[in-house]
């Protein structure tokens, strides 16, 4: 199932398919998020923002919903 990272449920593992080439997407690439990388939404604050995203096995990144919408992912486990 393909979706954007902002719509991915908490706890679901996913793989990054694409990242937008808009300035926000480029910033995410600079932070180390790349296509093919495993990610997981660890936490969504009340109201959905911010999100805590586990990126690979290396770090956790805090993102706004608007930023997470630039990342397209597909589920790797159901």
Predicted regions and their residues:
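Compact, glycine-rich, soluble single-domain proteins
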Residues: 1-78
């Amino acid at each position: 199932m393909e979706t954007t990272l902002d719509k991915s449920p908490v706890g679901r593992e996913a793989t990054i398919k694409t990242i937008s080439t808009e300035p926000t997407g480029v910033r995410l690439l600079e932070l180390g998020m790349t296509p093919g990388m495993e990610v997981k939404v660890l936490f969504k604050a009340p109201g959905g923002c911010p999100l805590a995203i586990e990126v690979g096995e290396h770090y956790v990144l805090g993102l706004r919903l608007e930023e997470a919408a630039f990342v397209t992912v597909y589920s790797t486990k159901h």
